[in-house]
Amino acid sequence: MAQTEIYIINKDRHLSGEYVGVNGAMQGAWLIWMELEKKYLPSLPLKPWDNPGEYKSRIARRFDEHAMDEIWAIPRMKETEWSDRILMEIYMDSAYVGYDDLHEVAEALRNCEFATDNMKGQADALEKIHEEYPGILGVFINATSVCSISDFLDCLYDDDGEVLDMRLKEDAYDAVQYLRDMEKCDWDIEKYFETVGDE
């Protein structure tokens, strides 16, 4: 069964080697993307052979280049609720959750209208990490163990291909802080890069 993997990040941006696995990854980020797509985006146009009234998702076309771009833009849409922004942003490829925001992210996962056992399990794990690991930078969440973490992290391997060390990539960013900065810029990405992005 695919798991959502939550990795602990030390202050030096290296992963501690410890992680929490939460079963049922398809009921985590994947479900969040599907539900928030329906909430904020219109259905794709139906074909004659589609069922009338059916919601046609962009996710079904995920292997087409740019098919998911509108979904990834949901956190920056002005009408998106704050907790939904968090639910989307924490799973972005280069995002991590800062230590001080673990409680807020846990609440967003636990209290969303379609919360599943996976989401509640993630929330419990984040609360426990906050309690047991003071002083860490935060956590990196790999949406599903089916994905290779080397796609999102810099990994150092030994001669046998075993991972010796993992660290955040240079372009990794604090997901919730990014949303706060974007809110100050009224969700204007160009204004963000002019004012905050170059800091």
Model-derived segments and spans:
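Feature targets compositionally biased, intrinsically disordered low-complexity regions
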Residues: S16, V20-N23, Q27, P52, ...
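Short amphipathic alpha-helical segments that mediate assembly, nucleic-acid/protein binding
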Residues: P52, M68, S83-D84, L102-V105, ...
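Context-gated lysine
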Residues: K11, K38-K39, K47, K56, ...
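Acidic, proline/glycine-rich low-complexity IDRs
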Residues: M1-E5, N10, E127-E199
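Short linear sequence elements within intrinsically disordered, low-complexity coil regions
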Residues: D12, G24, E35-K38, A60, ...
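Low-complexity, serine/threonine/proline-enriched polar segments
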Residues: I32-F114
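Charged linear interaction tracts used for macromolecular binding and regulation
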Residues: A73-I74, W82-C155, G161
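Short, extreme N-terminal segment that most often corresponds to the first beta-strand
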Residues: M1-D50, F193-E199
